[in-house]
């Protein structure tokens, strides 16, 4: 889901940073046990997976669902389930266009039991993402746009904050942090191979002059949005 989980090797991004926005709001190099189906038909590559859901106890205002795939225990719980899918298209020479999505429940995916008042709380998480890459004419251009909605965010925040922190005997591994109901990340980077203009180097090496711009918010909507305005970040980088 997202560019960061499909194309995360060092030659898939400029500088030493992956997409900072996606890295903040999504699990990175996301791996979970599940059942997966993938393949390719002509210019289309597809992949789908059924797996356990994320753990809402690990969510937070400045990381959204980033830590949801981790576990504070020596094992990973699977009380709730989720599905994800991805399609990559290569119809245009040198260009990849991608769509990916995720949907699943996140609440009660922990050892902590909830009272009957939370029976209808599921913490449904939906993520949609678009990505692109172009490698032509000595240019590399990459872009990503990811949006997510989390249902029951306020009710889950109340549930998490009702328990002591993990440092106490009966504590919870929760971050005790408000959880956003929406988060987003958009980014664009472009680099030009300047060695392509030097005949003695054009066939041997590559040196890219690049720039990147990102705009992301891990607390784009929520009851305490005013208090967490700093979770919106605009970032520029050149190299």
Kindly label every feature range from the protein language model.
Residues 94, 98-239:
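Outer-membrane beta-barrel pore domains
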């Amino acid at each position: 889901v997202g560019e960061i989980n499909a194309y995360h090797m060092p030659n898939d991004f400029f500088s030493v940073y992956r997409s900072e926005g996606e890295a903040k709001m999504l699990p990175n190099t996301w791996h979970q046990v599940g059942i997966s189906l993938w393949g390719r038909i002509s210019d289309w590559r597809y992949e789908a997976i059924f797996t356990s859901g994320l753990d809402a106890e690990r969510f937070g205002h400045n990381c959204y669902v980033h830590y949801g795939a981790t576990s504070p225990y020596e094992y990973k719980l699977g009380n709730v389930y989720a599905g994800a899918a991805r399609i990559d298209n290569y119809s245009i020479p040198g260009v990849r266009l991608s769509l990916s999505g995720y949907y699943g429940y996140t609440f009660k995916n922990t050892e902590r039991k909830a009272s009957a008042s939370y029976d209808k709380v599921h913490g449904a998480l939906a993520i949609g993402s678009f990505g692109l890459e172009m490698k032509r004419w000595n240019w590399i251009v990459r872009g990503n746009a990811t949006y997510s909605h989390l249902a029951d965010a306020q009710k889950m925040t109340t549930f998490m904050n009702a328990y002591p922190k993990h440092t106490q005997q009966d504590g919870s591994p929760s971050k005790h942090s408000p959880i956003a109901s929406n988060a987003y990340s958009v980014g664009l980077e472009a680099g030009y191979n300047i060695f392509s203009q030097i005949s003695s180097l054009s066939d041997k090496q590559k040196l890219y002059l690049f720039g990147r711009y990102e705009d992301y918010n891990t607390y784009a909507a929520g009851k305490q949005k005013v208090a967490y305005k700093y979770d919106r970040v605009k970032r520029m980088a050149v190299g």
